[in-house]
Amino acid sequence: MFSFYIPEGKNEVYRAQVFDRMGQFVDYATANDAVLLHENEKGIYGEKAKECRELMDAFSGEHFKAIFDFANFVQAGQDTLEAYELLKDSIAYVHVKDALAANGNVVPAGMGDGNVADILKRLFENGYEGFLSLEPHLFNFSGFAGLEKGKDAIAEGETKVLSGFEAFSLAHESLLRLLEKM
């Protein structure tokens, strides 16, 4: 779930309203024995790790936990290692996709600036047993030819439109390569 979209630069103006509404959601989830997973989506209260931590401090427990999305943090200008350190005790679900800080383009896991391999390693070393959800938002993937050459080549590479199957296969293969190196 997302918290709420907030006009840019207005987090403090809407903070109380966001927390009131999120509290209502968490109360409902608690009453119905459900778990809400909050994602760090761009443009919401909670796109940056600091706001996610504030939400976790207020509501984290059996019925409210965090989703960690590497690409969304990169696209929001958030250092993912810093985000992980702030949120590691609340992460229950991981969206596996990466992004380039230079332009925000989504790329296969490990090919961007999200520190995916390092953070996955830390998660597993800390006993993470949650899900890894592939998010192959790669249908208009720039840099297909640069996959073997690294992220600089990807940023400058050709564009190829991928089918859903191709995008999922690429996302899956990229994750497997990272996991095999651990």
Give residue ranges: language-model regions.
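Alpha-helix N-cap/loop-to-helix initiation residues
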Residues: 11, 44-45, 76
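Histidine-acidic metal/acid-base catalytic patches
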Residues: 23, 49-68, 74-182
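Residue-level detector of transmembrane insertion/anchoring sites
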Residues: 29-30, 59
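Aromatic-lined carbohydrate-recognition surfaces of secreted/lumenal glycan-active proteins
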Residues: 34-47, 68
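Surface-exposed cleft-lining segments at the edges of enzyme active sites
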Residues: 7-13, 38-41, 104-107
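A structural signal for alpha-helical segments
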Residues: 13, 17, 39-40, 47, ...
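Structural motif corresponding to the early beta-alpha repeats
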Residues: 1-24, 31-35, 72, 129, ...
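Short, conserved structural micro-motifs that define repeat-unit consensus positions
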Residues: 1-5, 41, 95
